[in-house]
Amino acid sequence: MQQVISHSLPRRHNNILQVFKSYYQLTKPRIILLLLITTAAGMWLGAKGEVSLFLLFVTLTGGALASGAANAINCIYDSDIDYIMERTRWRPIPSGRVKPRDALIFALTLAATSFTLLTVFANLLAALLAMSGIVFYVGVYTHWLKRHSVQNIVIGGAAGAIPPLVGWAAVTGELSWAAWLLFAIIVVWTPPHFWALAIYIRDEYQEVGVPMLPVIEGNEETARQIWVYTLILIPMTLLLVYPLHVSGAIYAVLATYLGVIFIKKAWQLLKDPSNKDVARSLFKYSIYYMMLLCLVMVIDSLPFTHGITTALADSWQTFIGGAIAILF
């Protein structure tokens, strides 16, 4: 783990609320929100739209604690480069508000609480998956890949794809092909998401020596790979409809619509790979895309939604049958 660099000046907390705020910031709550949304999507799909509110609360809480633990350890490890990068230098550790040792104790406490909560109130599989997410994010991505491989995001993206597996396991006690497809969707979504950001802040990554794809291969190659991953991603999302049959018509239509917008934005970046505004637009949309895709999964999985689509399908078949009878 990296120690906070020496010229980071300590800052005192003036009250207990500032202490809570600093430790809260260590968990990177904005990242956790998206992870919890994918967890919920996994739960609803796995339970076919009928999820216990208590189990939902327990699983999301356990997932949030596990993600917070991983993020806090990441903050410890990256405190040296966080101080250099403009957007991260005021994080709790590089700014001196939290000591690395205290952050580690905090992270381990979160992880232990998460494991206990998920084991007792969900099941052991969900708990072990949550812990594997911490190990992969810290050990494989943060320690091994981030500063040493241009494929850091491609391989490391698996850590961010574990939450839907946790959600699915919490409600079913097992992992089906559909659960692994959710995992694969997020793995493939991750490179376009992060590489768009990397184009936007390429100079910062270059300054601290992180080998992101735009730094090593340039913006044009990065935009090309974003385009390829996007073209793979969109058809993958429709595999939930066929052949897996875990999502229906509403999901198919809206997932296609969201995907078309994603493709359009990736195409715009391909045509103008050095345009930071276009890269930033794609990065922001990729977040909305994943949130909305998961929301559509949840809506489509609800029992009353299936009732509506079934009624519409029956009405359409009746209409077509009547029209054919009149014509022939």
Swiss-Prot record:
Pathway: Porphyrin-containing compound metabolism; heme O biosynthesis; heme O from protoheme: step 1/1. It is an enzyme of class 2 (transferase). The keyword tRNA-binding does not apply. Its EC number is 2.5.1.141. Its main location: membrane. Keywords: Cell inner membrane, Cell membrane, Heme biosynthesis, Membrane, Transferase, Transmembrane, Transmembrane helix. The keyword Cell inner membrane applies. It is found in: Cell inner membrane. The chain crosses the membrane at residues 31-51, 53-73, 120-140, 153-173, 181-201, 226-246, 250-270, 285-305. It is a multi-pass membrane protein. It comes from the Bacteria. One of its GO terms (cellular component) is plasma membrane. Converts heme B (protoheme IX) to heme O by substitution of the vinyl group on carbon 2 of heme B porphyrin ring with a hydroxyethyl farnesyl side group. Belongs to the UbiA prenyltransferase family. Protoheme IX farnesyltransferase subfamily. HAMAP family: CyoE_CtaB. NCBIfam families: cyoE_ctaB, PRK04375.1-2. This is Protoheme IX farnesyltransferase.
